[in-house]
């Protein structure tokens, strides 16, 4: 992958011409809350490369994500969306028998992904659960965390959609799925398998889905987007429209340093 992803330098080429697929983060990269980032729609329309939207957010279905993007003016569909919920469900299906019960800590969209791969989503450890999948939901409370804990302590496989400590909102950073994962970790002494960025599975699935030979990861967070790209030997672009700043880049460990940096998507 790393050899195939080394673009041939060309002084006449724009950045995007060196790559065949853009793997784009969502919040902070192409939109902020309910609004597209200024210039993002036009910047993406200018390209001829394939554009896939890759998100750690497991709370919405690919169709809901695509609908939101289309409503904001982006030209896409659900086939170009890769979510950590899809990846987590795939990881479960590869490790436990078809029809197995899985405690779902998360939204109905996450439960739907579990069902789509031939597993049985449940909300109680007492329903014969052999696995737990954990993704963000604003409704997550003690009761479902207790069910997850009981299942894991009983030997259930544990897959987390992501371990993002915070979640961007229009009012600022709020607790993310990683904060809830930490609670279950503390109660079980176990570590989950992780589907989303910066772990490799979501990047691997995005590359497989897109058929990319020279992908470029585009995102606003050093600790997820850029670290995930570096972990899988993929070129990366940090845009300064979200969480991480230019100062953060200067302070970052080598594992979180982007190959390219730009104020916004116009850099493409």
Q: What do the PLM-derived regions correspond to, one by one?
A:
Residues 1-26, 31-46, 58-82, 89-268:
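Asp-based, Mg2+/Mn2+-dependent phosphohydrolase catalytic module
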Residues 49:
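Conserved phosphoryl-transfer catalytic core
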């Amino acid at each position: 992958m790393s050899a195939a992803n080394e673009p041939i330098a060309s002084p006449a080429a724009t950045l995007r011409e060196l790559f065949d697929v853009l793997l784009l983060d969502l919040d902070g990269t192409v939109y902020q809350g309910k609004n597209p980032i200024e210039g993002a729609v036009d910047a993406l329309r200018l390209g001829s490369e394939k554009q896939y939207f890759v998100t750690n957010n497991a709370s919405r279905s690919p169709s809901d994500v695509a609908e939101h993007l289309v409503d904001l003016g982006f030209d896409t569909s659900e086939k170009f969306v890769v979510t950590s919920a899809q990846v987590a469900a795939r990881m479960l299906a590869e490790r436990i028998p078809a029809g197995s019960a899985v405690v779902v800590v998360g939204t109905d969209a996450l439960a739907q992904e579990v069902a789509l791969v031939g597993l049985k989503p449940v909300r109680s450890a007492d329903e014969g659960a052999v696995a737990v999948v954990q993704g963000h939901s604003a409704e997550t409370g003690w009761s479902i965390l207790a069910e997850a804990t009981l299942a894991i302590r009983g030997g259930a496989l544990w897959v987390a959609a992501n371990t993002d400590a915070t979640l961007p909102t229009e009012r600022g950073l709020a607790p993310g799925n990683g904060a809830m994962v930490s609670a279950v970790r503390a109660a079980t002494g176990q570590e989950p398998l992780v589907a989303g960025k910066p772990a490799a599975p979501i990047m691997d699935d995005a590359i497989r889905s897109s058929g990319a030979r020279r992908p470029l990861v585009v995102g606003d967070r050093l600790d997820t987007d850029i670290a995930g790209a570096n972990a899988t030997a993929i070129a990366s672009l940090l845009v300064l429209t979200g969480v991480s700043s230019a100062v953060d880049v200067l302070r970052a460990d080598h594992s979180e340093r982007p190959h390219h940096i730009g104020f916004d998507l116009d850099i493409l």
